């Protein structure tokens, strides 16, 4: 068997649908966004969109509509999933807790029926009498809406018109009436039917219209007073209501296809339209009032408002704000202005919602050489195309930096007690202290009266009674604010030097070697309260007040040399409350008591970058739940700071980290800076909510990005990226991309817009000796769109496009690899292409081109003609392995720098994907699942080892280990095949057994080995083997890792128990959602653990946790089974969350 754990590292980001209404209350305006399996609920405020709740559905959201039946005070939500689970949801809030209640649910799948090519359509009658669904050709399904019905029951009505393009319910009809566009051999037509609930039949509708535009694709039902429907086509927009027929053909809409629409006004006088090029239009219905007071339509008008992201859906929010939901680019709320700007646009983007989808390809690289992978994806399409650099951690935006080597500490000050913001920064150096005055964004050096500047400062700050304090190696100095003067000074009785110190607003603890002294701060006086001797020298200490102790800390935390211990002492007596031996040789360098999400912790960092953290009881001073993580390799300094009103800790070291709490568990996120030795929070007029950071040579002031798990940087390329690879020697990425050009009158083509391939620093064009340009059998016509393919060379540091190489006309670049070949010392970019002509069923010729990029120049080293499309290429034992149509071929690289065929394997339909390990080759086929080949170096040929005989239409493949192979197929499933080495007969051995099945609910485009987290983080006891990342069409990034059998069994048990405790939204069974499902078969999931479900354990209440662990057997590593506690499982799950 094979045991795997699959989990989401980045939730889907592509927006598939959006609606607006009054869901959370009658007064709120809500925006609901569907991102595949996730539903996000926002409330529209004057400041912008405020997130209320995010709901994970057990299904892909196919239909999402708000409606309000009679007797309801606010809107209800109807959702239908791709596996035909229907539910009606209601928002309930009591105090802090928010629940999404399932009012009614049911599955509306038919046992037979052909799913419609135009997808699932779900509509609701405006009077809320019924829900209509078009799921299968020739059938219209009706769900009657009864208030009391807990179960959604549906019936089918036969529809003679098999090929329905779009359907809507009309407004203002006595009986529910549908209006639809359908296609038959004669063309496209519009028809209406009344739906009779009693007879469960269609009755003749009020009107119909034969032979509308051949490309008519959308129906918009218009509310009263107009009524009727608008039909939108490629070139024309028409209005019908039985009496009135009006058609317009504005040239402006011809360039592209309109794909979405949304009503602006309740009376239907204005509609927003969005097209495939990202243009936003307004459709206006002009009215005419008749003598008898009725209103009829006078005219239709279309106006271009401007350009947005390419819209998948549009919804009008309020006050001229429209939400543009995008699948191919970032989504954005946009403001519609009355007047146009200089570019003639009426649209302004207000903010952007990052979308990684569709992830077409990706690679993992460690650019910073820090042992941490970054994921670089080819994301988006057309003008929304971009590269996304995704790393685990937090970004800091630099606002100012000053060259100041040797900083040993820094603190913010308010020089005037009445100020709200900091205006001074105190910097400490060996043997001296300097003071910087902040004036707006200007920084100048100054002197503070009462402060000494010829000694190193250990602490400095504003303290009680409007005073300042400076602790230096010689003394503790209390300075009055008005006037600035020294009012009290404490020195060690024998005038010894202070070694470490800590201070809060009214308490000071200093250490002099082994001696500890406790002082209190009074008006104009430092009062020594107590002192004690420890058995070893004090290495670090802290007196941060926790809880509601009025700024006084009853505890003091210290770390000692020699015995390497952390201790909690009681103040003022210095009585020992708890002693924790840390073990090892390395001394504690920094200790900190802090509170995250109302839980108290003690953090203790050692000189080698290790960090211990404990739960701290502030009443007793006892430590519990000892845990250890490795943050860096250098001594670590811990400092607290606040961000968005929550406390976080910054760990300064060679790998700076922010420690924060999420769902009552600590999260360690690294920061995108090389090293930080010291930091302090800074909130000045010129630099609000900032951080001051010092490394060996520089002082930097910056602000921190929103604290979250992943940091995403966008590099727009404004065309479609297809493939990416990294080349270390040239410090570049190679990217295959394609831009759209339009045939002009002269027979040439022109680009639609500037993009990466037209804006590169240098460029070149293929001229092939293999194909003469006149060989093109295909003539394009005026106005036709053609794809132009390029290889882009992109700098790994600046992401500048250094070079763009354009391929031949009709030549599609399909595969890309960077590698060395044979004994040749050079590293090459190699591109596989196909010549694509519309009249050919599959490509008959293509080429493999070998490029070398060095010294800023791209040279073509070799090219090889092939008889087909080069779908995939990998470097294989110093040779080049390629799949060409149905053939897998191995090329060797000769001394003459030519590719020579060594051997072939022919038994495929279409070999799309190749992965290798050692001498093994995994081939992913278009429709025949996966195949395992072995290369025999002695014979110089391929041997077919085994294949999966199930028909799977593959979208990506990966080798997990020597015996297990991962596949993703086009019905959103994952599966694992296993080589059966122990089989007795040859026939059994030739079968790859499907040992893992799982419904991911995402279309996977790419798998790659790698991880987004530091590889040595924490002493983990959860053995996960390997890490494969996956990228999907919806911008979701997932991770698959292998488990041992015992861990799999524990997690499977836990998964089953969680399913009993966690109630799913829409009452969809988890086992139904995750079952492997294709048109051919449905089988229960096996061999996979649903990591998202396991991780949800951390979000449930303590009593529910107890319910899950009741009688659960658990082996804590001692080999003995015992009953698990909730804390055992919390530890296990927390460790699992750290793998992504």
From Swiss-Prot:
Any Pfam family: Beta-prop_RSE1_1st
Region annotation (WD repeat beta-propeller C) maps to 709-1043
Q: Iron-sulfur: present as a keyword of the record?
A: no
Q: Where is this region: WD repeat beta-propeller A?
A: 13-356
The record describes its post-translational modification as:
Phosphorylated by ABL1. Ubiquitinated by CUL4A. Subsequently degraded by ubiquitin-dependent proteolysis.
Region span, Interaction with CDT1 and CUL4A = 771-1140
Q: Which cysteines are joined by disulfide bonds?
A: none
> At which residues is the cross-link Glycyl lysine isopeptide (Lys-Gly) (interchain with G-Cter in SUMO2) found?
1121
Q: Which residues carry this modification: N-acetylserine?
A: 2
Q: Where is this region: Interaction with CDT1?
A: 2-768
Q: What is this protein called?
A: DNA damage-binding protein 1
- Protein species of origin: Rattus norvegicus
Tell me the lineage of the source organism: Eukaryota, Metazoa, Chordata, Craniata, Vertebrata
């Amino acid at each position: 068997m094979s045991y795997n754990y699959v989990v989401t590292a980045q939730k889907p980001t592509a927006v598939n649908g959006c609606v607006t209404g009054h869901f959370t209350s009658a007064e709120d305006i809500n925006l609901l966004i569907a991102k595949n399996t996730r539903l996000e609920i926002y409330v529209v405020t004057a400041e912008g969109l405020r997130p209320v709740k995010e709901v994970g559905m057990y299904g892909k959201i196919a239909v999402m509509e708000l409606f309000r039946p009679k007797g309801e005070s606010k809107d209800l939500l109807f959702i239908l999933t791709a596996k035909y689970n229907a539910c009606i949801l209601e928002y309930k809030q009591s105090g802090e807790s928010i629940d999404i209640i399932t009012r009614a649910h049911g599955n509306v799948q038919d046992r037979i029926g052909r799913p419609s090519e135009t997808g699932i359509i779900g509509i609701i009658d405006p009077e809320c009498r019924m829900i209509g669904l078009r799921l299968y050709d020739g059938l219209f399904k009706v769900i009657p809406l009864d208030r009391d019905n807990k179960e959604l029951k549906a019936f089918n009505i036969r529809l003679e018109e098999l090929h329905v393009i779009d359907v809507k319910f009309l407004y203002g009809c006595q009986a529910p009436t549908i209006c639809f566009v359908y296609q038959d051999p004669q063309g496209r037509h519009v028809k209406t039917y009344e739906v009779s609930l009693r007879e469960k039949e269609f009755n003749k509708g009020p009107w119909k219209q034969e032979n509308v535009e051949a490309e008519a694709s959308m129906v918009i039902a218009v509310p009263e007073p107009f009524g009727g429907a608008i039909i939108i086509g490629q070139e024309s927009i028409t209005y019908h209501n039985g009496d009135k027929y009006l058609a317009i053909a504005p040239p402006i809409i011809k360039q592209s296809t309109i794909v979405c629409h949304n009503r602006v006004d309740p009376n239907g006088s204005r509609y927003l339209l969005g097209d495939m090029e990202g243009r936003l239009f307004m459709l206006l219905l002009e009215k005419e009032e008749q003598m008898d007071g009725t209103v009829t339509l006078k005219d239709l008008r279309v106006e271009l408002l401007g350009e947005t992201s390419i819209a998948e859906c549009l919804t009008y929010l309020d006050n001229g704000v429209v939400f543009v939901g995008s699948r191919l680019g970032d989504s954005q709320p946009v403001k519609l202005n009355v007047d146009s700007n200089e570019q003639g646009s009426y649209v302004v983007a207000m903010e952007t919602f990052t979308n990684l989808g569709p992830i077409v390809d990706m690679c993992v690289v460690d650019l910073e050489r820090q042992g941490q992978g970054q994921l670089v994806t080819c994301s988006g399409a057309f003008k929304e195309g971009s590269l996304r650099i995704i790393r685990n951690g937090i970004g800091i935006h630099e606002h100012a930096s000053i060259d100041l080597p040797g900083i040993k500490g820094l603190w913010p000050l308010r020089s005037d007690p009445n100020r709200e913001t900091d205006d001074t920064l105190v910097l400490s150096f060996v043997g001296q202290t300097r003071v910087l005055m902040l004036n707006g964004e200007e920084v100048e050096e100054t002197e503070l009266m009462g402060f000494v500047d010829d000694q190193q400062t250990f602490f400095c700050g504003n303290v009680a009674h409007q005073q300042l304090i400076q602790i230096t190696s010689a003394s503790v100095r209390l300075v009055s604010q008005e006037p600035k003067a020294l009012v009290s000074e404490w020195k060690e009785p024998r005038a010894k030097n202070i070694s470490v110190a800590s201070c809060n607003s009214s308490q000071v603890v200093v250490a002099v070697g082994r001696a500890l002294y406790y002082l209190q701060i009074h008006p104009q006086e430092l009062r020594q309260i107590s002192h004690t001797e420890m058995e070893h020298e004090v290495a670090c200490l802290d007196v941060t007040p926790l809880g509601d102790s009025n700024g006084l800390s009853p505890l003091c935390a210290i770390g000692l040399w020699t015995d390497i211990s952390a201790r909690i002492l009681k103040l003022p007596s210095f009585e020992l409350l708890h002693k924790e031996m840390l073990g090892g040789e390395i001394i504690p360098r920094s200790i900190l008591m802090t509170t995250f999400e109302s839980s108290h912790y003690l953090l203790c960092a050692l000189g080698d970058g290790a960090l211990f953290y404990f739960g701290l009881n502030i009443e007793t001073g006892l430590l519990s739940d000892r845990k250890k993580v490795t943050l860096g390799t250098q001594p670590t300094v811990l400092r607290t700071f606040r961000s968005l009103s929550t406390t976080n800790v910054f760990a300064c070291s060679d790998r700076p980290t922010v420690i924060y709490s999420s769902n009552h568990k600590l999260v360690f996120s690294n920061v995108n800076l090389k090293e930080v030795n010291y930091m302090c929070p800074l909130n000045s007029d010129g630099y609000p909510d900032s951080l001051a950071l010092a490394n060996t040579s520089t002082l930097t002031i910056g602000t921190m990005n929103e604290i979250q798990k992943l940091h995403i940087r966008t590099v727009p390329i404004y065309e479609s990226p297809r493939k990416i690879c990294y080349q270390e020697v040239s410090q570049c990425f190679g990217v295959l991309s394609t831009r759209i050009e339009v045939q002009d009158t002269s027979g040439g083509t022109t680009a639609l817009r500037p993009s990466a391939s037209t804006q590169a620093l240098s460029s070149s064009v293929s001229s092939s000796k293999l194909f003469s340009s006149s060989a093109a059998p295909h003539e394009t016509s005026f106005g036709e769109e053609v794809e132009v393919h390029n290889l882009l060379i992109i700098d790994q540091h600046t992401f500048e496009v250094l070079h763009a190489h354009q391929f031949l006309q009709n030549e599609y670049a399909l595969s890309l690899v960077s590698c060395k070949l044979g004994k040749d010392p050079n590293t090459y970019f190699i591109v596989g292409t196909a010549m694509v002509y519309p009249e050919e069923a599959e490509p008959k010729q293509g080429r493999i081109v070998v490029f070398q990029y060095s010294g800023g120049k791209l040279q073509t080293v070799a090219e090889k003609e092939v008889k087909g499309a080069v779908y995939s290429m990998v470097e294989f034992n110093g040779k080049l392995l390629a799949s060409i149509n149905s053939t897998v071929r191995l090329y060797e690289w000769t001394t003459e720098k030519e590719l020579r065929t060594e051997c072939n394997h022919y038994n495929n339909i279409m070999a799309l994907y190749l992965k290798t390990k050692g001498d093994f080759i995994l081939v992913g086929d278009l429709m025949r699942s996966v195949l395992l080949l072995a290369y025999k170096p002695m014979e110089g040929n391929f041997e077919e080892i085994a294949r999966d005989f199930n028909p799977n239409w593959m979208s990506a493949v990966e080798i997990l280990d020597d015996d297990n192979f991962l596949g993703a197929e086009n019905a959103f499933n994952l599966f694992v095949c296993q080589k059966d080495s122990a089989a007795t007969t040859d026939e059994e051995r030739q079968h790859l057994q499907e040992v893992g099945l799982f419904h991911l609910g995402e279309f996977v485009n790419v798998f790659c080995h790698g991880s987004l987290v530091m590889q040595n983080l924490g002493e983990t006891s959860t053995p996960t083997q390997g890490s494969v990342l996956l990228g999907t069409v919806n911008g979701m990034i997932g991770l698959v890792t292998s488990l041992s059998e015992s861990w799999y069994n524990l997690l499977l048990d836990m998964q089953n128990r969680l399913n009993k405790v966690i109630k799913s939204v829409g009452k969809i069974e988890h086992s139904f959602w995750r079952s492997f499902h294709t048109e051919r078969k449905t089988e229960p999931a096996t061999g996979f653990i649903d990591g998202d479900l396991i991780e949800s354990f951390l979000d449930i209440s303590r009593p529910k946790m107890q319910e899950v662990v009741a009688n659960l057997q658990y082996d804590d590593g001692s080999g003995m089974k015992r009953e698990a506690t909730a804390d055992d499982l919390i530890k296990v799950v927390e460790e699992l969350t750290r793998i992504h």
